[in-house]
UniProtKB/Swiss-Prot annotation:
NCBIfam families: hemC. It comes from the Archaea. The modification S-(dipyrrolylmethanemethyl)cysteine is found at residue 241. This is Probable porphobilinogen deaminase.
Amino acid sequence: MKIRVATRGSKLSLLQTQELLDQVKAVEPKVEFELVVVKTTGDVVQDRPLYQIGVKGIFEKEVNLAVLRGEADVAVHSLKDLPSELTPGLVIAGFSRRAPPYDVVASREGYSLYTLPKGAVVGTSSVRRAEFLRAVRPDVEVRPLRGNVDTRVGKILSGQYDAAIMAMAGLVRLYGWEAPVKLSPIRPEEIPPPPGQGIVVAVVKEGEAWLIDILRRASDRRAAVEATAEREFLMHVGAGCHVAVGGLARYEDGGMSFVAGYASGGRRYVIKLWGEDPREVGRRAAEEIRKIREGD
C-alpha cells in the first residue's frame, strides 16, 4: 500500500511530515509513502509580512490543492497554518503528538521577555506576537522578520536582531534541545500562542474511509482533543490574521484548561477557563474574547 503525501519542501516541513508518517508506520508497518513537495505562496513571497500578502491560507492552499486534484492522497500541515474552515471536501484526519506549544524569546544572550534590554530590536512578522509584545514590553523595538527558522536564527546570531519571538515547536523539531540560540519560553498568560501551534495534521478528502481510519488510529489522542477545542475557538472568535488573538487548550485528567487572549493598541486581555467538553470550552473562550474585542 502506497500513500502519496503532499508537503511543503522546507527542512522543518519535511521533518514534521516524517514525524507524522512515523506514527502511521507504527500502526500500519507495511504502508509506503511517496512525498509530493509543493511550493506555496508563503514560501515564495519573503519580502513582506504575511498579513500584507493578502492571501488566505498562505501556507496550506496549494498543498491541499494537490489532494483535491488527485495528485496526492494526504496533505500534511502545521495545524496553526490552517484557516478556521477548510476547503469544502477536505477533513482533518490525523494528529501528531504535540511539541511544546509555547512561543519563546530566542536570543544569543538568553533574554527572557522581561530581561530584554530597553530599546532591544525584537523580530517578528506575526501581528499577534507584535501586539502582545508591545503591550508587555512597550520599551522594545519590534521589527518585521520573515524567512524559515534557519534564516531567522541566522539573523539573531549575526546581530541584526537582539532577539526574536518564535515558536518553540519549530525550533525543537529542527534542532532538538540544542538550538544555536538560547530559548526562554513565554507563558501563555503573557503571549497566548496561536491555536494549533505544535501539532502537525493530515488532511484528506471526505469519504476516503480507509485512509481516515488509518490516520485516526495513528493519531495522538491528547493532541486531537486539544486541537478540537482550539479549532472551535478559532471558528467562533471571528478574527483574521490582522487581529492579535491567541488560544491554548491543555487536556489533563479528563478536564481542560483554556487560556485565550487579545491585544490591541498597547493593551492586552487574557482569560482562563476550565471545562470538560472541548468544543464547549473553545466556544466559551471565543465568546469571552469577542466581548472584550467589541468593548475595546
